[in-house]
A protein has these predicted regions:
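C-terminal and inter-domain tail/linker signature
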Residues: 1-123
């Protein structure tokens, strides 16, 4: 796949997640997708992760600010905004690297890791 096709896959994935459409995972990730940052293995783990994010932040949105593609990897810088049920607002920047093979994401890494104590403070 071309670099532009790989970027288009990441763009489609982001657009679907912004709509809370988790069905896109079946189309654009492999069944054994690995999220190295959050130690997720498989589409079901990723689905559970985003289900929690969407529950904790009913208003959640990612904007792509930068894209770089090289070989089978796409680097993307996101501006993430959200509002917790408490009304507390968040805004942070993350950088993700996704490896794309045959039109599907097979693994990814994200910085910063937004889990644990830091995640709880956001709520």
């Amino acid at each position: 796949m071309s670099l532009e096709e790989n970027k288009a896959i990441v763009r489609r994935l982001n657009e679907a997640l912004n709509k809370k459409d988790l069905a896109i995972l079946d189309e654009l990730t492999t069944p054994d997708y690995v999220d190295h940052t959050n130690q997720l293995r498989g589409q079901e783990d990723v689905r559970k992760f985003y289900t929690r994010v969407f529950k904790d932040f009913p208003v959640w949105h990612r904007i792509i600010e930068d894209f770089i593609a090289e070989g089978d990897k796409v680097w993307v810088r996101f501006k993430v905004t959200g509002t917790a049920p408490s009304g507390k607002k968040i805004e942070l920047t993350t950088v993700s690297i996704l490896r794309i093979v045959n039109g599907k994401a097979v693994e990814g890494w994200t910085v910063p890791k937004v889990t644990g104590e830091f995640y709880e403070k956001l709520l």
